[in-house]
């Protein structure tokens, strides 16, 4: 019998849409339903386009849930959000024999105490995107975000004496943009900050990069870094050492990202700025890493294994 999976209710960083597309390639009847379309990642099969105040929005969501319920075997929720209030959502799913997953994406759990996330135990399974995120949800399954690698043809970094450094902050303070600007001012580089663009246009900017700086505060990398690595770019970001070790053990490969803090960014960038061959070798290793860890088709297999045990 064909498995029917509804992913909802947001398309944060494009992760849900990548998952839906990969599951479809596996023969799953998968769909993405969102509250509203995001500017950066507008992809979805159905947008509720909620209007009005809280009560009207809740009615819109409840009607959508009622429509989706008979069409769905597994509800795959994201970002700590559900279609109807959590106090109703999970009891209703259990009463109707439906399976559920809560998939956390990073900023929805970062820094929150366990008691604040205990509600997620009502879901059939919990997923996080990295071993770093297990600090907040230690009993979750780790499924790194996947992308369709066929959409990302590697573009090797150039030999430019003033290489292009690309930084694409979703939130400047959280990503350490001020420190990135200060560091690049001390080096012979061209800094391009990519903000507020549609995803296709943003990716064209990423393709021009010789070096990519992701973030300096979070302790792990996000989808921007994954896309940059898929394009064969060397990525500089701040990583927690324990999460690096656990990732390398789990996947049997080195994490090729250049680890930096705000204090060490200049010294970590300098070798990449001065050595084009180093840029290319790190970029090639980055593409190989993404093929192993972030291939959307492999991610779909991990999701199917989780669904099967619910």
Language model segments and positions:
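Short N-terminal targeting/anchoring amphipathic segment
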Residues: 4-9, 65-85, 101, 212-215
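Active-site proximal beta-strand in glycosyltransferases
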Residues: 74-79, 90-110, 125-128, 142
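Donor nucleotide-sugar binding/catalytic pocket of nucleotide-sugar-dependent glycosyltransferases
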Residues: 109, 121-154, 160
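Conserved donor-binding/catalytic core segment of Leloir-type glycosyltransferases
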Residues: 156-175, 181-184
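A short alpha->beta transition loop at the rim of the catalytic pocket in nucleotide-sugar-dependent
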Residues: 210, 230-234
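Short hydrophobic beta-strand element within catalytic cores of glycosyltransferases
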Residues: 234-243
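A charged, aromatic-enriched C-terminal amphipathic alpha-helix characteristic of glycosyltransferases
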Residues: 277-307
